[in-house]
Amino acid sequence: MMTQTDLSAFFGADLATADRDIFDRIGRELGRQQNQIELIASENIVSKAVLEAQGSILTNKYAEGYPGKRYYGGCEYVDEIETIAIERAKALFGAGFANVQPHSGSQANQAVFMALLQPGDTFLGMDLAAGGHLTHGSPANQSGKWFKPISYSVRQQDQLIDYDGVAEVAQREKPKLIIAGGSAYSREIDFAKFREIADSIGAYLMVDMAHYAGLIAGGAYANPIPHAHIVTTTTHKTLRGPRGGLVLTNDEAIIKKVNSAVFPGLQGGPLEHVIAAKAVAFGEALQPSFKDYARQVVANARALAEALLKSGVNIVSGGTDSHLMLVDLRPKGVTGRDAEHSLERAYMTCNKNGVPFDTAPFTITSGIRLGTPAGTTRGFKEAEFTRVGELIGEVVNGLAVNGPEGNAAVEAKVREEVLALTGRFPIYN
C-alpha cells in the first residue's frame, strides 16, 4: 500500500527525479533536434502548446465512442475537446464531416478500407517504387494481404504520374477504390482527373493527403476535398501537429461507415490527449500566419532543389511543387544508405528512399528523400535552404569521390557550418 510519502512523490516528482534514464535520453534527443537540420519530409517541429496538450492529464481519460455517445461516464470535457477538434478540422479543409480519432494515418487508411471494401476487393494505388505508400497495397502491409491491390506508376521519361496509364488500368481491372496520393511524390496531383477516372468506372476516389495536408490547409497545394469521396491524412508532417490520423468527407453515408470502422472496428478508446493536441494544431493552422508558413515551405523546397541541381545532384522529375523532393543518386554511384549515414554525420537528417524504377534493395536504395517543413518551422528561408542544398551537394559529391569510409573531412567541415546555422535559429530554448 502506498504511503502518503509515496503518494506525494507519485504526484509531485518530475521526470528528472522519477526516471533519470528516460529524462537523460529525452535531453539528448532535444540536443539532436536543436543542433541538426531535420530534412525528413514527414517530420516537423510542434509548438509548445501542442506539446502541453499532448502531455496533459487527458491521458488519464478513457472515452470509447463518440461525443455524446460514450461507453464511459465522465466524458463531459473530452466531448467538448473532441467536438472542437472536429469543427476545426472541418473548417480547415472545407469538409462536411471529420473523424479525429485514428491513431495514425495508416489506421485512417485501414478505416476507409474497412468502411468501403470487402476482403478480396480490388483497389488501385500508386506503386511504392513510384512514390506511393506501404498502406496503398504493399504485399508486406495489411492492405496488400486482405485486398487485391493493383498499381499505377510514373512515366519513365519525366517521372510524372501517367494519368493515361491510370485510366487504362482502371478500365481494365475495374477497382472498387482508387487512391491518389503518396509518400514520395513531389509534384502537384490532378485530383479532378483522378475523380474523372474513378467516375468512369463507378469507383470510390480516396485521397491520402498525409504529406500535403499542411500545404493544402495553407492554400499552397490543391485541395482534394471537392473531388474525393473520402480523404485521409496524418496530423503531423506539414500540418505541424501531433502524430495521429484524420478522415474527412462531404458524404454523410460514408462518414457513418468510417465512424463504425474506426470504433469499434479498429480501435477502442481514442487518445483524448492526442485529440486535444490535434485541436490545438488545427487552431494554429487556421491562423493567417499558417498560410505564410505553407507558402514558405514550398518556396524553400524549390530553393533547395535548385541548389542541389546546381551542385550536380539529380532531382526526380527535375524539381518540386511541394515540401519534398527525391534525389536520384545513381548518376553519382552513391547509395541512399551511404548518403543518409554520411549526411547524418554532417548533422543533416534525411532518409534513404527508393526512386522510380530503382533496382537497389529497399534496405540500400538509390536515393534520398528531403523535405523542408521542419527547417521552415525553425525560421529558415530561401537563403538558408540554398546553403543547405550546397552543403548536401558537398557531402554527396564527396561520397562519390572518397567513398563512405573516406568522407570524414567533408562531413566534419559541413557539420561545423550546420552547427553555426542551427545556432542562429534556435528551438525550444
Swiss-Prot record:
<dbReference type="InterPro" id="IPR001085">
    <property type="entry name" value="Ser_HO-MeTrfase"/>
</dbReference>
<dbReference type="InterPro" id="IPR015421">
    <property type="entry name" value="PyrdxlP-dep_Trfase_major"/>
</dbReference>
<dbReference type="GO" id="GO:0030170">
    <property type="term" value="F:pyridoxal phosphate binding"/>
</dbReference>
<comment type="function">
    <text>Catalyzes the reversible interconversion of serine and glycine with tetrahydrofolate (THF) serving as the one-carbon carrier. This reaction serves as the major source of one-carbon groups required for the biosynthesis of purines, thymidylate, methionine, and other important biomolecules. Also exhibits THF-independent aldolase activity toward beta-hydroxyamino acids, producing glycine and aldehydes, via a retro-aldol mechanism.</text>
</comment>
<feature type="site" description="Plays an important role in substrate specificity">
    <location>
        <position position="236"/>
    </location>
</feature>
<feature type="binding site">
    <location>
        <begin position="132"/>
        <end position="134"/>
    </location>
    <ligand>
        <name>(6S)-5,6,7,8-tetrahydrofolate</name>
    </ligand>
</feature>
<feature type="binding site">
    <location>
        <position position="128"/>
    </location>
    <ligand>
        <name>(6S)-5,6,7,8-tetrahydrofolate</name>
    </ligand>
</feature>
<dbReference type="InterPro" id="IPR019798">
    <property type="entry name" value="Ser_HO-MeTrfase_PLP_BS"/>
</dbReference>
<keyword id="KW-0554">One-carbon metabolism</keyword>
<keyword id="KW-0663">Pyridoxal phosphate</keyword>
<dbReference type="InterPro" id="IPR015424">
    <property type="entry name" value="PyrdxlP-dep_Trfase"/>
</dbReference>
<comment type="pathway">
    <text>One-carbon metabolism; tetrahydrofolate interconversion.</text>
</comment>
<comment type="subunit">
    <text>Homodimer.</text>
</comment>
<keyword id="KW-0028">Amino-acid biosynthesis</keyword>
<keyword id="KW-0808">Transferase</keyword>
<dbReference type="GO" id="GO:0004372">
    <property type="term" value="F:glycine hydroxymethyltransferase activity"/>
</dbReference>
<comment type="pathway">
    <text>Amino-acid biosynthesis; glycine biosynthesis; glycine from L-serine: step 1/1.</text>
</comment>
<dbReference type="InterPro" id="IPR015422">
    <property type="entry name" value="PyrdxlP-dep_Trfase_small"/>
</dbReference>
<dbReference type="Pfam" id="PF00464">
    <property type="entry name" value="SHMT"/>
</dbReference>
<dbReference type="GO" id="GO:0019264">
    <property type="term" value="P:glycine biosynthetic process from serine"/>
</dbReference>
<dbReference type="InterPro" id="IPR049943">
    <property type="entry name" value="Ser_HO-MeTrfase-like"/>
</dbReference>
<feature type="modified residue" description="N6-(pyridoxal phosphate)lysine">
    <location>
        <position position="237"/>
    </location>
</feature>
<keyword id="KW-0963">Cytoplasm</keyword>
<comment type="similarity">
    <text>Belongs to the SHMT family.</text>
</comment>
<dbReference type="InterPro" id="IPR039429">
    <property type="entry name" value="SHMT-like_dom"/>
</dbReference>
<protein>
    <recommendedName>
        <fullName>Serine hydroxymethyltransferase</fullName>
        <ecNumber>2.1.2.1</ecNumber>
    </recommendedName>
</protein>
<dbReference type="GO" id="GO:0035999">
    <property type="term" value="P:tetrahydrofolate interconversion"/>
</dbReference>
<dbReference type="GO" id="GO:0005829">
    <property type="term" value="C:cytosol"/>
</dbReference>
